[in-house]
């Protein structure tokens, strides 16, 4: 909704995969570095069964449940066949929701997404070729692009607080929002 009123640009530093991509998908413009690790548009569900481990350790755990499905997420027993089907359906549903976010946010056909999704990981360069990002650049480039999208004057003509924590190492920065908070508050 914010992107309808004000342009939202997602800048991907070193890594923006899975959840990082999910929150970026609706941005008006996604900028990554050529070697950003991104994608991982998929869902994994892990449910441990630790009963045997605790038995080997001599630990006796007791679970009290009320309701037929109350112990669904318990690690004290294996899944029943019905629960396994439910678990698989939850994962399939979550994956479909993730793909829907990508399809809508990136304006890509939902039915054509599996070749670039299914948990596959891409570099920024590969993501650009697959329309998962719009351009490459560093954080400074992202600030300039956002100013352009917002029809602001050239960002070099006024102060925009940008803290490059790695100025001696590279122009590709990974901003630390809590460390930048003081300068941002003073700018607002």
List the predicted regions and their residue ranges:
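Active-site-proximal helix/loop microenvironment
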Residues: 113-137
């Amino acid at each position: 909704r914010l992107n309808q009123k004000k342009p939202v640009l997602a800048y991907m530093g070193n890594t923006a995969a899975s959840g990082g991509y999910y929150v970026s998908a609706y941005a008006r413009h996604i900028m990554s570095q050529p070697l950003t690790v991104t994608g991982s548009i998929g869902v994994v569900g892990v449910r441990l069964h630790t009963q045997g481990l605790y038995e080997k350790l001599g630990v006796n755990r007791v679970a009290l449940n009320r309701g037929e499905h109350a112990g669904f997420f318990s690690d004290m027993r294996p899944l029943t066949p019905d629960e396994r089907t439910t678990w698989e359906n939850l994962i399939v549903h979550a994956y479909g929701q993730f793909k829907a976010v990508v399809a809508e946010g990136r304006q890509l056909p939902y039915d054509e997404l599996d070749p670039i999704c299914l948990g596959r990981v891409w570099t920024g360069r590969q993501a650009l070729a697959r329309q998962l990002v719009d351009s490459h650049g560093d954080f400074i480039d992202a600030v300039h692009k956002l100013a352009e999208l917002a029809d602001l004057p050239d960002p070099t003509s006024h102060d925009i607080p940008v803290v490059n924590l790695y100025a001696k190492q590279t122009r590709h920065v990974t901003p630390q929002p809590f460390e930048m908070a003081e300068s941002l508050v003073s700018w607002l």
